[in-house]
Structures are given as structure tokens and as C-alpha cells.
Amino acid sequence: MSSRSPRPPPRRSRRRLPRPSCCCCCCRRSHLNEDTGRFVLLAALIGLYLVAGATVFSALESPGEAEARARWGATLRNFSAAHGVAEPELRAFLRHYEAALAAGVRADALRPRWDFPGAFYFVGTVVSTIGFGMTTPATVGGKAFLIAYGLFGCAGTILFFNLFLERIISLLAFIMRACRERQLRRSGLLPATFRRGSALSEADSLAGWKPSVYHVLLILGLFAVLLSCCASAMYTSVEGWDYVDSLYFCFVTFSTIGFGDLVSSQHAAYRNQGLYRLGNFLFILLGVCCIYSLFNVISILIKQVLNWMLRKLSCRCCARCCPAPGAPLARRNAITPGSRLRRRLAALGADPAARDSDAEGRRLSGELISMRDLTASNKVSLALLQKQLSETANGYPRSVCVNTRQNGFSGGVGALGIMNNRLAETSASR
């Protein structure tokens, strides 16, 4: 009987396990730096947007400016030669005219700048931040008063714009919800006896329904276009501008850019002057409020694009730091069956029972740690839920979301804070 030499135990190849904290640290850093990353990314995109805009406008307007300079130089030389006036004296006279022009003096008869209607038009352009520039204070007292007056006036007007945005979003949500209820009632998905606030409405899907930001954007855009077209028709007939110039004036005014190259209601007299000034005031007020609301809705779309770009960058970062989806992970505190470990120990000739106690101890420790974390998170969730139910019972429903950074829209100040949780894209459930 030949004695075989005992086979050496198979060599255990130690797998290089990935560092479990790398991905967590990466995700934690991206979570903490989400606002900073969004700010830096938006600043970079705005910089590129400015460069692109400057390139386009320079290509469009620079040739016309060069031609205008050449024509003006030729006109100046011809006038100097024809009338026997030295060119330096003529330029000095033109500088005096420019100073008078800045003070409000025009060759044609214009309305007084600082009577009560003119001053009211001026303060309207100040507090709305339009600032046409056709009228400016020239005295020291007027400039000092403008600083204090504009500080509180602009702040109050911005608050008015935000409240208008809140009202218009609530109105659109109410109308679109009513249309959706009517559509569901026609299709038979909603009972005819359905009423808001009933027990059925709480179980129905309409209880958490919110309008989409794209629908609100479409409605506000159509209203802004309609308002601009009507105002442009009025300015074309009264001011004598081209229709394109009138549309250009409407956008410059409604968006509070206020270049001042075209300014309405500046002639000394108009036909139906009182009616025209009232219409001009109402069109500018509604236009500024509408375009302000439209800008804030567009900013939600821009923020969605920024969040999408940040998610893509975060996924690429985590893909470099974390293992592939199919790679085995060693979880220290995971609750896993011990059959695979016993089979490996039996194949190696070791006694599985010798290591069961140690493995069982580690597994129980992991269970205790996991249960402790779960209990703590449940306490936080229960406290938030109790707060939400209490506020709802008192008539002040506030949506509370545990994952406050799921969509990047929770919280916020100003217009973003007003639209938070009022649209489908800014809802805390997304």
C-alpha cells in the first residue's frame, strides 16, 4: 500500500477588496459641495454666455458703427468747409450741445421732465429698476434723496413682484387643477360627487397633483407675447415707431433692461393724452410683472439643467472611485447567511464550528449597529411627520421632506423659495 503524500491545502488567494469608504466619501463630498458646484458651474456658463453674446453683437453692430463714424466725420468736415467754421470750434459747440442733451434739452419740443407727471414717470422707472436714463437728478439734494428713495423703493417693488409671482402661480395651479378634474370626470375616472376637501380627495391622485413647470412656462410665454403685441400696436399708432421697434421697446422695458434709446410718453402733447398715459402705465406694470415671473420659471429649467450636469459629473466621479456593479463587495455589518463561509472552510479542511462563534458575534454586532441607525432615522422621520401633521391640522400645511436635496429645489429664498413645492418639478417628492 503506497502512501501518498498529503496534498497541500489550496493556496488562498486574497482578494483585494475595494475601500468601502471611498464612494461614500465621494458622495458625501459631492452632497456637501452641491450648492457650491452649482454656483461655480452657473458662473462658468454665464461667462461663456457673455463671451458668445459679445462675439455675436460685435459681429453685427461693429460694421454699422464704423460706417456711422465715417459718415459723421465727412459731414463735420463738409460743414466746416461750407460755413467757414474751424473744426475745433465746431467740436466745442457740439460738446455744449451734448451737455444740454444730457440735461434734458431737446431740439424738438418735449414735455417738462420735472413736473408731477414727469417726476412720477421717473420714480416709476427707479423703483422698477428700469432706469431709462432720459431723466436724472442734477442737484446734490436730488442725488442724495435718490439713494435713500431707491433703496427702499426697489426692495418693496421686488417684494411686490415676488407676491405677484406667488399669486399667478397659485392661480395657474388652480385653473389647471380644475381642468384636470373636469377631464377626469368626463373620462369616468372621477365620481360626479367629487368635492375638494372630502375624504375621497385625500385618497385620489389629485391630492398631490401639481402643474408642470413646462405648462406654466407655456402659459406665461403666450401671455407675455400677447401683452407685447397689444402694447406694440399702441406704441406704433401713438409714438409713430415701427412695429419691430415697438416690440424691441416692450422687451427692453418689461425686462427692466431700460436702455433709454426709445422712451414712451415723451412728447409735449398726445391725442387722448390721459388715456394713453394710463394705458402706458398699465402695460408697463403688467409687462414687468409677467416677464419677471417668466424669468423665474425659466430659471427653474436652468437649475434643472445644472442639476443634471452635476449628476453626470458626480456619477463619473463615483465610477472612478467605486467598483463596478458586478464586483463583489465586502460589507462589514451586512446581515448575510453563513453557509458560503462554512462551505469555504470545509473545502479548506478547517472546522467550521471553530469559527462560527466569532462570525456569529460579528454578525450580531452588525445587526445591533444597523438596528440602532434604523431606530435613530425612524425617530427623525417620526418627528418630522408629527410636525407636518400638526401644521396641517392648524391650517398651515407645509410640505416636509426628509431628503432635503433630492431635486435641488428644496429651501431657497426669493422667487425660488416662493415656487418651492408649488410646481411638479420643484415638488419635494421628486
Swiss-Prot record:
Residues 256-261 are annotated as: Selectivity filter 2. One of its GO terms (biological process) is potassium ion transmembrane transport. It is found in: Cell membrane; Endoplasmic reticulum membrane. One of its GO terms (molecular function) is protein heterodimerization activity. Glycans are attached at residue 78. Changing residue 14 to A: Disrupts ER retention/retrieval signal resulting in localization at the plasma membrane and K(+) channel conductance. Results in 174-fold increase in current amplitude. GO terms for cellular component: endoplasmic reticulum membrane; monoatomic ion channel complex; plasma membrane. Changing residue 11 to A: Disrupts ER retention/retrieval signal resulting in localization at the plasma membrane and K(+) channel conductance. Results in 174-fold increase in current amplitude. It catalyses: K(+)(in) = K(+)(out). Changing residue 16 to A: Disrupts ER retention/retrieval signal resulting in localization at the plasma membrane and K(+) channel conductance. Results in 174 -fold increase in current amplitude. Residues 11-16 are annotated as: ER retention/retrieval signal. Belongs to the two pore domain potassium channel (TC 1.A.1.8) family. This is Potassium channel subfamily K member 12.
